[in-house]
Amino acid sequence: SYYYESWLENTNILFSLDIDAPVQNFDSLKFEKLIIQNINIVIKFAKEFYNHEYKINDVIVLKTEKQPNKFSSHIIFRGLLFENHKVCRNFFTRIVKKEKLNYCDSSIYGKTCLRTCYSSKKGKEYPLLPVKIKIGNEFTCSVSDYQTELDFFVQTLITTVDEDELKSKMVTEKMIVQEYDVPSLEVVPTNNNDNNSEYDLSEILSKLPEEYCNEYVKWNRVGMAL
């Protein structure tokens, strides 16, 4: 299957990580250690920023088999609800200002989409599969924690809001602005010649590899960047 989950500007959402690590730097064991390290960092700063304590079994880890050029994983953190993707992006930005989240893709915090559990990228056979990881003396959430595999799948969607999230404090844009002065995204200086803007854009698009035109996620990211 080749399914993706998407969201709108004001969709309530859970925090997640998208990790892609090059095979030349990692083996399976090192990649699992990277996953654990990044999970612990998110747990640490959720407590520091929002006074929320993620439990290890609030965390769902999805991982592909080793690919020719990389290891990939999606991590979903259940239990704390964010007002929208912009608030998630702010959480990520504030974390990385204090501590590195190695090999994590920040582009997922836009108005974009995320590949679902059991799905692969089109034309490839590396689906994201649930894995159970031991962190300290506890294990991350797994299929066996739910009555059915469908129940588990629904919980892997970051737009699924259940009773636990509704009971907890939602992290809103208003709260973030009141607590912290959120900096704007850095703008790269460009040539101010408006007459050349259309030409420059055509030049950029003409030099894109073909795969960027054939894969929705990559094309979507190009659009957001431009």
Question: What is each PLM-predicted segment?
Answer:
Residues 103, 109-110:
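Long, composition-driven mixed-charge/polar low-complexity segments
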Residues 110-190:
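Long, low-complexity, charged/polar intrinsically disordered accessory regions
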Residues 142-149, 193-200, 218:
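Non-membrane alpha-helical secondary structure
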Residues 1-73, 77-101, 114, 120, ...:
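Signature for HUH/AEP ssDNA processing cores
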Residues 111, 216-221:
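Short basic/aromatic active-site micro-motif
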Residues 115-118, 220-226:
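Short, hydrophobic/amphipathic alpha-helical patches that form generic packing surfaces
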